[in-house]
Each structure stands twice: as structure tokens, then as C-alpha cells.
Amino acid sequence: MDKCVITGHHFSVENMNHNNNNYDFDNKNNSIGGGGGGGGSSSSRSSSSRSSSNRSSSGSSGGSGSNSSSSINNIINSDNDFKTERKQTKSPPLTLPNIKTTTTTTTTTTTTTTTTTKNENISSSESENSSSRVGSPNCNKKVKKTKTITISPTGYNINSKDDINKFTTYGYTNEKSNARRDPKWINDIIERYNRLKSESLNNNYNGSSSNNNNINNINNNSNNTTSPCQSPSSNTATITSISSPTSSSSSLSSPSFSINNIVNQDVDENDGCDRMNYTLLSQNNNNNNNNNNNNNNNNNNNNNNNNNNNNNNNNNNNNNNNNNNNNNNNNNNNNNNNNNTNTNNNGDECIVKPISLIQNKKSGQRSLKTKEHKEILEALYRVTLYPTSEETKTISQILGMTFGQVKSSFRHRREKLSKSGLFSYAKNLKNCGKSTAPLDNFFENCKYLTTKETEEFAAAYDVSFEQIKNYFKGKRAKLNKLSSKAIQDKDNQDNDNNNSNNNENNDDSYSDEGLF
């Protein structure tokens, strides 16, 4: 059977030679767990829920093996409808899009491995071309032939093996990891995202050049200037634009960085940059100097306007007054800027608050993801596609989404990847294509399985041992829940009946004596 194991964004298809223990559900002569053997007595396991006729056996000279195997065989073959549902055709092989195959050399990405036995001599050219062959000529050795299948989805590039080992799991995987991950990895991704975005903005500032006149024009023409100490709005996910002496324009281009940098970047704790609070120390003095220059320029403009008013006619006086009013407004704006920056004249650090991704969402409302939400969710998808409940709750709190929205987002991502062939669900009893009627019938007679019976059912359904065990465990839990609810309902009904009887007795206790 071909099994698709996905590691990172590369695929490894392994042809595994299973034991010939697959159960033929259409053949009545088959038995699960072994064939007929010699004479002897097989032990019987006593249980309160099992009948002695089905679970005990006596010795004979021509016995047919263990009775547990025959009982399971009888249960499976007893249902005719179950037999018709078993008939299925072989599933077609998995087709993967954008596949690039090479058969000459081996790589460290993904391999398709088959094991064969060679008795003939291996030529020197073949041994040079296939570096994966083990052994020397004229020896019976197991030879491994490799076939490389490389898939490169758009937007993802894995440069080396070190990138794969950055986190516990990397890339799309179809296994639910039982290992408990440290929930700190979610905060690390958010912090790295904030840090990379701030660094990209700082690089854009440092890479441009301008003069003081452009700064004066920007400060004079903008009425709604923001202080570098001002925090961005809680409903937006962008950093507040900061006026810098090296910037030539008030608008900035969007930063460019990939998801690989968010996930794989190594963070140095002692690099002088706080990942959540970004300090701007030299900005305060520059802002104060610029404001002083603006005040001087405005005073000169006022003097020039006054001289022009004396020389012009009466018709131009109104225009000059309007100019003076505009200059006064500019002075007021500059004074407001000075008031905002006076708090930092003592040498205190001006801290810009980090990006806020929290958006207030109501339950049942569709989540409107921003660009930052999508980039962070994409980085989270690549760590795991099966987040735990604690991780889902943490993500919902950071992104301002509800628990159900985050859960459905991961489920939709898995479905989308499975349709494109980049992700495959692990095989279980639900998608194995076989009915669970024999398991249900067996559960009615016996609520617990032995280890041997569990292995036999796992071989018959071609699933893991734990899946059969968990199936019976879930049915027992459901039965206990139903029984406890039934007992509680019965107790409530008894209490209601007792209360009604007490009320009737109280009504009958009133005597009719004295009425006549």
C-alpha cells in the first residue's frame, strides 16, 4: 500500500510491504488471527458479559484454532449487508500537482524507497550513478532505489534542512502530534512579525534623503500631525507613520518580507532592540530643532506679510488678512507639536507601542481578515495544522477572533490543501471505506477487547491499534453518559411523582367535619 508522508513541503511516498494478513471480507473460509492448528484445548476467559458457549472451547483432535478468531470471523461474516458494503475498487494513486521528478541522483529532500534483492553483478557505471546502493558486487544485498519527488508550492521556499528544524513540526503534516508544544511559540511568531515590520520601515527611512525645506513643507501643510509617542488605533494593524529628518515624503511603501523570515528568523535577545517596544531616542531632538526652525520661518513670513499690507491697496487687505490667519493657524499647529514633544525634553525614551491586531468581533460574525492577519495565520499554519484548544484560545485572543473562527480557519485550510493534494488526512475508521457494523455487534456482547482481539480488528480494517482501542473507549464513554442521563431523568421523574403524591395527600387531609 502506498502511504503518503508529508515532511515540510516535500513528499515521501514509501512502498511498504505489509504482512499478508489482510482480511478478505468476501471469503467465508478466512479467519482473523491464524488458521487451523493441531488438537488441543484452548483456554477460555470468564467474563460476566460473555456467554460460555461463545467464549469457551473443548479439546479435539482436529481443532480449528482459537475460538476468539472464529467468533470475530462469524460476527464479520454474519451480516449480508455488511458484505455488500465491503466490495470496493482499488483507489487510484495520489496525483500531485507541479511535480518535478529526477531519477539519476539522490537528494536529501524526499525519497521513494523500494527494497529488492540483487544476485547479478552491478556495473561500475550504475554504482557511480546511484549513490544510495549499499554493498559490493557478487553479494546478495538489499539495494535501495531512490526516486526524487519535489514539490514547490508558490510562496514557500525551503533553503536547507536547518529551516525544517526551527520548530517542533514544520510544514503541512497529516499527523496530530501528541507532544505538548510550548504555547510561547505563538507569541514568538507575533513578536517576530512586529519586529520585521518595524525593521523594514526603519530601513525605508534610512535609505531615503531629503532637506529641511521638505520637512518644513510637510509639517506646515499637514494639519493632522501625529506624535511619535502616539499609539496606533486598536482597530488597525499598521505602525503609525513617524516624521523623520531623513524621510522625503509623508507616505511609505508597504514593507516586503516573506513568511519564511517570520518563522525561521533567529532572535538575539541581546541585540539592543526590544521585540515588543521600539525606542526612538534621537528623534526627539530632531523634532524640537525642526519646530524651532518652523517658528522662525513663520515669524519671517508674518513680517513680510505686514510690509506687503502697507504697500498694497485696500482690495488686497482682505487677502493679506487671510494670509495672516493661515500663518497664525500654522503657528498654533507648531505650538501643539512643541507641547507634544516637551514631555521628552528631559531625556526620556519615546516608546512606540507595538502593532495591535485585536479587533472586536461578535460571535457568529464572519471574520474579516486583514493582510497582517493572513500573514500571521499563514505562519501559524506552517507550524501545525492541528492546534490544541489552548493554542486556539491564545490565537483568538491575539488576533481578536472568536474561538470558532480560528478553529474553522484551520479546518478550511486543511480542506483546501487536501483538495490540491498537498495534504492528506490520516486513515481512520471513518474514511477507511468499511462499515463498523461488526465492531458495533461485538460491542453489544462485550464492552472490552483483549490485546489479541484489538490487533485482529486493526489488521482487518487496516488501521492502527490505538484507533480500534479508542473506538471502543468512546462507545463506552457514550454509553456511560447515556446511562447516567437516564438514571438522572428517572430520579427526577420519581421526585416529581413523590411531590405530586404528597400534594394529593395534603389535599385529602382536610376534613369535611364542621362544614355542616
Swiss-Prot record:
Gly residues compositional bias: what residue ranges? 32-41
Q: Where is the composition biased (Low complexity)?
A: 22-31, 42-59, 66-78, 101-132, 284-346, 495-504
Q: Which residues bind DNA?
A: 362-421, 424-483
Q: In terms of one coarse class, where is the protein primarily found?
A: nucleus
Q: Mind telling me which Gene3D superfamilies this protein's record contains?
A: Homeodomain-like
Taxonomy, superkingdom:
Eukaryota
Q: Where is the composition biased (Acidic residues)?
A: 505-516
Region annotation (Disordered) maps to 22-140, 200-256, 268-348, 483-516
InterPro entries, from UniProt? Distal-less_Homeobox_TF, HD, Homeodomain-like_sf
Q: Which GO terms describe its cellular component?
A: nucleus
Where is the protein situated, by its record's location annotation? Nucleus
Q: Name one GO biological process term.
A: regulation of transcription by RNA polymerase II
What's in the keyword line of the UniProt record?
A: Coiled coil, Developmental protein, DNA-binding, Homeobox, Nucleus, Repeat, Transcription, Transcription regulation
What are the TM regions of this chain, as residue ranges?
none
Instruction: Kindly list the GO molecular function terms attached to this UniProt entry.
Output: DNA-binding transcription factor activity, RNA polymerase II-specific; RNA polymerase II cis-regulatory region sequence-specific DNA binding
Task of the protein: Putative transcription factor.
Record protein name field: Homeobox protein 6
Task: List the lineage, top down.
Answer: Eukaryota, Amoebozoa, Evosea, Eumycetozoa, Dictyostelia
Name of the gene encoding the protein in the UniProt record? hbx6
